[in-house]
Design a protein with these regions (language model features):
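Acidic, polar ligand-binding/catalytic clefts
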Residues: 73, 77, 82-148, 225-231
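Bacterial signal peptide processing site
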Residues: 24-26
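Extracytoplasmic small-molecule ligand-binding "clamshell" domains
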Residues: 29-108
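Bilobed "Venus flytrap"/periplasmic-binding protein-like clamshell domains
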Residues: 38-41, 61-77, 109, 129-185, ...
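Ligand-binding clefts/hinges and TM-proximal coupling segments of bilobed small-molecule sensing domains
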Residues: 161-181, 252-278
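Periplasmic-binding protein-like
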Residues: 127-134, 213-255, 272-278
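A ligand-binding cleft/hinge motif common to bilobed small-molecule-binding domains
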Residues: 91-92, 108-118, 164-169, 192-193, ...
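C-terminal motif of bacterial Sec signal peptides marking the signal peptidase cleavage site
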Residues: 19-22
Length: 278
């Protein structure tokens, strides 16, 4: 009986993670439900109030802000719907869209070939470089290419292209690829503690992390030359939707109205407004 109750409780907890919008008849058709981690600055992060246009997180404490939130607000406005931000672990985002719990993923997600097998993606709304964040003063801080990280213990976030690239390419450069970690705050903590020598991030994320943490810096690698081998789709950021979603055309139309200069300004603002951790 005890084992049965334990299994039942585990099942209840798993279902509860999706219960907010898991049943289609519980979703308000006047709202769009957008999933993100709320912990991947400057794309998305959590703050304590609604300043700078932040949106209340529907299923957790705090308010969401960042580049992804700015994009989500423009999409909601274009669709004439109220924006609902739902916090998810990164690995749970695709299943949530597939189940209908979420309408969209706007979470700094790359439209990789593997992910396209599971969900559809919009046109790209950002494109970046993969870099490596290290401690200031570290012997690896002066590296100019991946070979400069020989012997370094480098990690990345689980379920990301960052980790795919690291695991596939580390050995060729003498890098010691570590077990992937769940979130960027965990990666930052591991780096500060000396458990790892660095972690893979995208340029804007690395810039924000180093702005928030003044003991960190990053090595500005360039894809396919001094850095990781990557295709355009690997380092593009796009909106994830359920296969065959009716929203795809409207989302692409909304994105097309956002100029490159406006996107650059949005990213700069998101980076500047990210909470400083010290």
């Amino acid at each position: 009986m005890k084992k049965f109750l334990t299994l039942l409780l585990a099942a209840f907890v798993a279902v509860s993670a999706l219960s907010f919008t898991a049943c289609g008849n519980k979703k308000d058709e006047n709202k769009i439900y957008v999933g993100m981690e709320c912990g991947y600055a400057p794309f998305n992060y959590t703050q304590t109030d609604s300043s700078n246009g932040a949106v209340k997180i529907s299923n957790a404490n705090g308010y969401a802000n960042g580049y992804d939130v700015m994009i989500a607000k423009k999409i909601a406005e274009k669709l004439g719907k109220e924006l609902v931000i739902v916090k998810y672990e990164f690995k749970g985002l695709i299943p949530a869209v597939q189940s209908g719990a979420l309408d969209f993923i706007i979470a700094g997600m790359s439209p990789t070939a593997e992910r396209k097998e599971s969900i559809d993606f919009s046109d790209a709304y950002y494109q970046s470089q993969l870099v490596i964040v290290v401690k200031k003063g570290s012997k690896f801080a002066s590296a100019t290419n991946l070979d400069g990280f020989k012997g370094a213990k480098i990690a990345a976030q689980i379920g990301t292209f960052h980790n795919d690239a690291l695991q596939a390419q580390a050995a060729a450069h003498g890098i010691l690829a570590q077990t992937p970690m769940a979130t960027f705050p965990i990666l930052i903590g591991a780096l500060k503690a000396g458990t790892i020598d660095g972690y893979v991030a995208e340029y804007p994320g690395a810039k924000a992390d180093c702005t928030m943490n003044d003991t960190l810096t990053f090595v500005n690698l360039q894809n396919n030359t001094t850095g990781f081998t990557a295709t355009d789709e690997d380092v593009q950021i796009a909106i994830g939707l359920k296969k065959g979603s009716e929203y795809l055309t409207s989302i692409n139309a909304a994105l097309a109205e956002i100029s490159q200069s406006e996107r650059d300004q949005m990213m700069q603002t998101a980076t500047e407004n990210a909470p400083k951790e010290g």
